[in-house]
Amino acid sequence: MHGLIADFIHYLDVERGLARTTQVSYQQDLTTFMAWLSDQKQTTFPEDFGVIQAFLKHQNDTKAPASVSRMISALRKFYRFLLREGAIKSDPMTKIDTPKKAQHLPATLSGTEIDALMAKPDTTKPLGLRDRAIFELMYATGLRVSEVVGLRLDQLHLAMNLLQVTGKGDKERLVPISPQAADWVNRYLQESRPRLIKHQQPKAVFVNFHGHALTRQVIWKNLKAYIASVGIEKDVTPHTLRHSFATRLLENGADLRVVQELLGHSDISTTQIYTHLSNQHLVAVYHKTHPRG
């Protein structure tokens, strides 16, 4: 069973060209599936619809709808692969419907909360200056955390206030960066990064104390710690900075298509969730400013 999963991941990489982050997510989902099958004394990947249904019911009881949807997507592709390779005779996933994602409004940070967060890292220390540069960059550009950790030195064009970003599906886009955020990144590059990389020559812009490329998990953990230390009680993740970036743009009159391009969304319907947030802002402004509001 391990071998089939490894073959599938290799297929996703070589033949489908899926992004590494997607490959890792699918591998984790299939490993979870295999562990559950082992608990059920199953030694092969089942073709029985009922077994798949029981597994997904277990997942629904313990995981968020978005995670279950991704799990179904992984299983659907995996079973197609197994059928193609002759490892199974029938595909039970054809009977499984993908649940509709519940659309929820993402959390955002106010201007005051952003200021409090930015002021928290100790910029007299290498790691503090690095963290400030990361937060300034994320809020100024709306980059995904995976795009931040994947950012290379040769993708920085700070003199032109531009970044060359590799997004989902390895699609590249140019993203503008504010002069303020560019200044913080420059400070990090000049003052902190040389002290962190020591004698190494990593291509990654952002590195850890040992000079290795930073991970998404470290940024997530550090952000959580800073948020807690300034007393913000919202459930804040790196994606919250991306949400806040998009919401501020729309509140200040940016065109939805422009925001779509900046965020790297392939489908504008993904971007449209932010219009609900900006509409809330419009209603609040109306009630505050209109004489009969």
Curated annotation (Swiss-Prot):
Keywords per UniProt: Cell cycle, Cell division, Chromosome partition, Cytoplasm, DNA integration, DNA recombination, DNA-binding
UniProt entry tagged with the keyword Transmembrane: no
PROSITE patterns referenced in this protein's UniProt entry, alphabetically: CB, TYR_RECOMBINASE
Chief location of this protein within or outside the cell: cytoplasm
Location of the Tyr recombinase domain: 104-287
Annotated localization: Cytoplasm
Family annotation (CDD domains): INT_XerDC_C
Pfam family, one: Phage_int_SAM_1
Domain of life the protein comes from: Bacteria
PANTHER family xref list: PHAGE INTEGRASE-RELATED (PTHR30349), TYROSINE RECOMBINASE XERC (PTHR30349:SF81)
Family according to the record: Belongs to the 'phage' integrase family. XerD subfamily.
Role played: Site-specific tyrosine recombinase, which acts by catalyzing the cutting and rejoining of the recombining DNA molecules. The XerC-XerD complex is essential to convert dimers of the bacterial chromosome into monomers to permit their segregation at cell division. It also contributes to the segregational stability of plasmids.
Oligomer and partners: Forms a cyclic heterotetrameric complex composed of two molecules of XerC and two molecules of XerD.
Protein name: Tyrosine recombinase XerD
Organism: Lacticaseibacillus casei (Lactobacillus casei)
Name of the coding gene: xerD
